[in-house]
Regions:
Chain A
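Arg/Lys-rich amphipathic alpha helix in sigma70-family domain 2
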Residues: 78-85, 95-116, 195, 204-206
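Short, charged helix-capping/linker segments at alpha-helix termini
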Residues: 17-18, 33-42, 52-71, 186
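Structural recognition of an alpha-helix C-terminal capping motif at a helix-to-coil junction
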Residues: 53, 67-74, 87-99
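Short helix-capping/turn signature of helix-turn-helix
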Residues: 46-49, 57-60, 166-173
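C-terminal edge and immediately downstream basic/flexible tail or linker adjoining helix-turn-helix-like DNA-binding
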Residues: 2-11, 112-119, 149-152, 166, ...
């Protein structure tokens, strides 16, 4: 639903009746600019999972990922007045998140937490072990386990390829939006996504042939579709 | 079409970005190349796995977010209400920087003054050079001159005498100029060292005296509390 700017600024009676779930992100942030905390809560509900999913696949640490997700959303609230509708709201949010993640990773690379005398084996090219589904094939793999395996596989992609890859594959941003978020040239975005896909495929290759896993994947997708339908109803 | 090019096109095609003029070429290649067909299927499955594996946030995420946001807003409001708090810290930092800069400046001025100021007459320079016209030539006995050279910068006994000898018996304050001709900061420093060392000597003497008294007390105590010899008489 599109609302005119006057309706936000002057608080028309219509506003009270509007279901926030029907309002576009870009209109919600205008409401936040006018001090409506409820609009911010709605944006949090829409973006917290997407941001966490994106950030976790970047930093691998769930605690740190939650912290950075919170930091991103707080910055959205504090700097809401800086948003201009020259770009989609999602582009703006993921730009903030990407910058925060990059800063954090830069800090971590300057201060390594652990130094080992024995260098870790070069495992970039090693595919991940597929989950052992023989123990309880009827139950299959849990969604959390799958999330952990995918996060580990994603972490094997070099960071410069991973950011555009996740923005495209998980967040479904267009190439132009990824270009805006990352500041890369369009051709570079294309080639990095292609290379990241290749690396990701190498990392999960054994899983791609696992019939039990593929069956569970179909069940997960069916459940997600049902939940979407319930939300719409 | 090579497979590497086809893989690039497959990626673009999955995102709906493949130009139509390349689509036909890719289709032809996929009809002929089983590896590239598998590659395309793998990418599709990988994308589905990634989408299905959305990680879950902890249950109290929103509550913690609200808490953190409220704290941030409260801190921001406090800064607006009491901006002097920030200014006070700024002012303290400014004073610290100023004090440091002033110390460096003072040290530099003193160093220049020491380097360029009048110096104590040395035995070789007395009566010679540009100072000779302004400085009354001190009468230094030959023996004292030698001592002056020998002790400058070392001890205080002979040095003290050499300073007084170098001044020809006059007090420094009676001399014209900032320090008076014939005086240098080195001479003043020597005098300070002398008085400091004398004070230290007095303290040391006092300590030695006290320790001697303590030692005497302990010896007398030892004499009075001395146990008899433990040597038992023979036969016991």
């Amino acid at each position: 639903m599109n609302l005119s700017r006057d309706e936000f600024v002057h608080g028309s009676p219509l506003q009270a009746r509007v279901d926030l779930r029907e309002i576009r992100d870009e209109d919600l942030i205008v409401m936040v600019q006018n001090g409506q905390r409820k609009a911010f809560d709605e944006l949090v509900a829409r973006y917290k999972g997407r941001l966490f999913s994106f950030i976790l696949r970047m930093v691998k640490d769930p605690t740190l990922a939650e912290e950075l997700t919170q930091e991103t959303l707080i910055r959205v609230y504090l700097h809401a007045d800086k948003y201009r509708e020259i770009a989609r709201f999602s582009t703006w949010v993921f730009t903030i998140a990407t910058n925060l993640v990059r800063n954090k990773m830069r800090q971590r690379s300057r201060r390594p937490l652990l130094l080992s005398l024995n260098p870790a084996p070069e495992d970039d090219e090693m595919p991940l072990d597929p989950p052992d589904l023989r123990q309880d094939p009827t139950e299959g793999i849990h969604r959390e386990e799958l999330a952990a395996i995918m996060a580990a596989a994603t972490a094997k992609i070099p960071e410069k390829y991973r950011v555009p890859f996740l923005l495209r594959e998980v967040e479904q941003l267009s190439y132009e939006e990824i270009q805006q978020v990352t500041g890369l040239k369009l051709g570079t975005v294309r080639s990095r996504i292609n290379r990241a896909r290749n690396r990701f495929r190498q990392a999960i290759k054994p899983m791609l042939r696992n019939e039990t896993l593929l069956a569970e994947l179909e069940r997960i997708e069916a459940r997600a579709a049902e939940e979407d339908n319930e939300d719409k109803d | 079409m090579r497979c590497t090019k086809a893989m690039e096109y497959i990626s673009l095609d999955l995102d709906g970005q493949l130009p139509p003029d390349h689509a036909a070429g890719l289709t032809r290649h996929l009809d002929e190349c089983a590896d590239c067909r598998t590659y395309r299927e793998d990418l599709q499955t990988a994308g589905r796995l990634l989408a299905a594996s959305e990680p879950q946030l902890s249950e109290n995420f929103e509550w913690r977010l609200q808490l953190r946001l409220n704290q941030t807003l409260a801190e921001a409001a406090a800064r607006e209400l009491h901006p002097w708090q920030d200014r006070r810290t700024d002012r303290a930092a400014w004073w610290r920087n100023f004090a440091a800069a002033a110390s460096v400046g003072m040290a530099a001025v003193l160093a220049v003054a020491v380097m360029t100021g009048p110096r104590a007459p040395s035995t070789a320079a007395v009566g010679d050079g540009p100072m000779a016209a302004h400085v009354a030539t001190p009468v230094v006995p030959a023996g004292d001159r030698l001592e002056l050279e020998a002790v400058r910068g070392f001890g205080y006994g002979a040095g003290q005498r050499s300073v007084s000898s170098g001044m020809g018996g006059q007090r420094p304050s009676q001399r014209p100029g900032l320090l008076g001709p014939g005086w240098s900061y080195q001479s003043i420093e020597d005098l300070r060292n002398i008085s400091r060392i004398q004070a230290e000597n007095r303290q040391l003497r006092t300590q030695v005296f006290q320790l001697q008294r303590q030692l005497q007390g302990m010896q007398s105590q030892l004499d009075t509390t001395a146990v008899p010899s433990l040597d038992l008489p023979e036969g016991q």
